[in-house]
Amino acid sequence: MTTQAPPTSLLPLSPEQLARLQAAVGEFSPTQMAWLSGYFWGRVNQQPGAVASPAVAAPPPVTVTLISASQTGNARRLAEQLRDDLLAAQLSVNLVNAGDYKFKQIAQERLLVVVASTQGEGEPAEEAVALHKFLFSKKAPKLPETAFAVFGLGDTSYEHFCQAGKDFDSKLAELGAQRLLDRVDADVEYQVQAQQWRQQVVATLQAKVPAQSTAPTQFIAPTQSTTPAAAAITSGGTTTVSPYSKTAPLTAQLSVQQKVTGRNSEKDVRHIEIDLGDSGLRYQPGDALGVWFDNDPALVEELLALLWLKGDEPVSIDGQNMPLAQALLSHLELTQNTTLIVDKYAALSRDETLIALLADKPALQLYAKNTPFVDMVRQAPSDLNADQLVGLLRPLTPRLYSIASSQAETENEVHITVGVVRYDIDGRARSGGASGYLADRLEVDGDIRVFIEHNDNFRLPANPETPVIMIGPGTGIAPFRAFMQQREVDGASGKNWLFFGNPHFTEDFLYQVEWQRYVKEGVLTRIDLAWSRDQAHKIYVQDKLREQGAELWNWIQQGAHIYVCGDANRMAKDVEQVLLDVVALHGAMDAEQADEYLSELRQARRYQRDVY
């Protein structure tokens, strides 16, 4: 769902009134805002001649503050479902994205519910980093009057499963808040747990808070949207609801699939263009494209042969009956393994090597990460039946790719930049599920199921004069191609600076001709390139950032927005450390002050990351 505000000329407020309103509401807590909402409603509905009096206004409702800390959209969707449940139960609720939450108001919360996803190696979702850091700082207040509940979303294929949810739960309790419910840690297949938890939350809150006698108030904290249309005001605009979603994707067509790395490159990167037709599907620079895919039929046949299964065995997936081969092809995950699957398979196969592996957690994590299910079966044979096999495997999930185009230029197309995952295990070639599908199996003009995952935490600045610093090595360059297309079409006068890196200049300079044109035409003000393998010593984008520290600080002082896209585990952490060092050195700050400064940039949406 996308929301666009009407032009200022259509608002029932003058620009001066709108400015005063926006300045005034910034001082109020969510609870106070909820009370004011009811107060103004009462003013509007008074009988003619009646005199409004705050003294006789109804007492402020007890509001449930619901914080969504989402990375890929799942936490946000769950929070929205819970919001609807609470409203249906006549409970006042304030749904807010973690990135928009004024966390210094947390001491005023009485009922707090957090839905938190985890990214990378146990880190909070990008929009929740500032809140997480605040709660773990010395500034966090005691919360003796707060009751809370936490639902954690994660992936058991990662070592630090649901760590962000665990962090929020333990820290809130440490600060003196009381648990309404025990924390829930949910895996990729979280829907059943989520539904049960939603019911428990509603029942618990209904017992704790009486239903409001008037219509429940729902105040949604304003999103600091950076799109020009939405920057003026976030309510009262027109809303366009797309019929397409993760569960109801658009069937589009592949129009272009082109390798954009050289023939001698160690990397296989593809530029993909998808025709959206007349679907009306809309996206913005910074959004991601969700891609549903089928597994490799050869991989399905290999697995069936290893288990001595025919593929025509009847199985049930989400209540739908189908042959086993069809379930393996289109409904079950085959290219990603988890420690939980290894654990269960070890018990079923009684393989001594796998059983011994369970006692060594680091080795188990490494094995699950590097050994797909089919290769585990080959290494530790067993005689699973069809139902046992289906019970072991996780449901297939779509992959998200940062969009590499702006509809201001490409109109009914969407572009993505895909790094194809390729590797060998025991001499057998393997490829990634979605990347292999896009590069090797999907034909041009073939159908592909897609949807848009909106990301309001990675947006161009509203002011076209604002300078932009883009840091995106490898396929992390994708959203910055979209950014530059948008800035060029908008005629944005703000300066643009790109940091890009890859192994070799001659083989791995993605979209080289386009960047050279942007530089020649003055759209791209600066470009700094890091080629890690073109000389004896390795050079990365973080080295270029440090080298340009003084100028980088000048741009920041001029109000530049900083964007980082790419690998979360190493690159993004290294880049952030260099940014801290640059701020400390050129801003004459100590480490703590530099950290606080960068946090302030993040809260002001001047430091945004799209990392994975």
Swiss-Prot record:
Pathway in which the depicted protein is active: Sulfur metabolism; hydrogen sulfide biosynthesis; hydrogen sulfide from sulfite (NADPH route): step 1/1
GO cellular component: cytosol
Binding-site positions, NADP(+): S532, R533, K538, I539, Y540, V541, Q542, D574
Keywords: Amino-acid biosynthesis, Cysteine biosynthesis, Electron transport, FAD, Flavoprotein, FMN, NADP, Oxidoreductase, Transport
GO biological process: cysteine biosynthetic process; hydrogen sulfide biosynthetic process; sulfate assimilation
Domain FAD-binding FR-type positions: 247-461
Protein name according to UniProt: Sulfite reductase [NADPH] flavoprotein alpha-component
Organism in which the protein naturally occurs: Yersinia pseudotuberculosis serotype O:1b (strain IP 31758)
